[in-house]
Amino acid sequence: MKPAVLALALCGLVSSTGISAAQEVKPLKVMLITGGCCHDYKKQTEILKKGLEERINVTVDQIHVDDGSTKPALPIYGNPDYGAGYDLIIHDECAADVKDEATVKGVLKPHVEDGIPAVALHCAMHSYRVGDINKPAKEGSADALWFEFIGIQSSRHGAQKPIEISFKNHVVTKGMKDWTTINEELYNNVKVFKTADELAKGKQEGEKDAVVVWTNTFGKNKVKVFGTTLGHNNATVEDPRYLDLVAKGALWATDKLDTAGKPKPGYGRVKK
């Protein structure tokens, strides 16, 4: 086994049949949404696309706008059927001031109504803030629209400092070891919804410990959502441990991760 494949195997991203079976399995079609305030999304969209396509059997289509505002002009707005034909949507946008309830419902429609699973990364948790973000939102209320879907409500972060990550036992985290990030943002937890399952906590000097990795199952379609608040800086996003985590979260959300934490046949790394 080649060294690169061996490294992925140690993280559970290559199964014994994954490479050969992947030749016969159609790649998962993934939409990656990036753009908005405060992050190097132009670079991060490329890091994520490359990292995911190297690790698992996916094709990543990028929906990116080079708009650094808190109201990025993403083409998904006003187009509630934007997810048609996709197996997974990754929300990595930062849109804190997109607050119109109808717009937020349109963003949620492919998930809540059509049942398309999701991955939510970093500032996605600080997007689509309808109502008072500092008060725990009541389930079913307009204030909870986005937060209830992703599973966690967050309102702020502190200064950038290293975060000590401690994982819990879960199929997504099998084979992963605790690690400490470079300087990063620890997002607070205003509320962790009952449907969310905590996978890792983060500890940072001067801040209260917070859930930083989780899964959520939401709504009438029991749509699966994998989330992490980690990933502000490019160096974190391109860290192989981070990319492994997001890749396994994507497989979990699409029901392509087995009980041993490995890709189901055909969904592991595709041999190039």
Language-model regions, residue ranges each:
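Bacterial N-terminal signal peptides
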Residues: V5-S16
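Sec/Tat signal peptide C-region and signal peptidase I cleavage site
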Residues: T17-A22
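Helical hinge/lid and interdomain linker segments adjacent to catalytic or ligand-binding clefts
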Residues: Q23, K29-I33, D40-S127
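Extracellular ligand-binding/catalytic regions of CAZymes and related secreted enzymes
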Residues: Q23-L28, K43, E54, A84, ...
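Active-site rim elements
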Residues: G35-C38, H157-P162, G231-P240
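Catalytic beta-strand/loop cores that center a nucleophilic Ser/Cys/Thr
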Residues: E53, T59, I152-K222
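A glycine-rich, often tryptophan-bearing local segment used as a flexible ligand/cofactor-contacting loop or short
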Residues: A96-G175
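Proline-centered loop/turn at the N-terminus of a beta-strand
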Residues: P117-V119, D197, K224
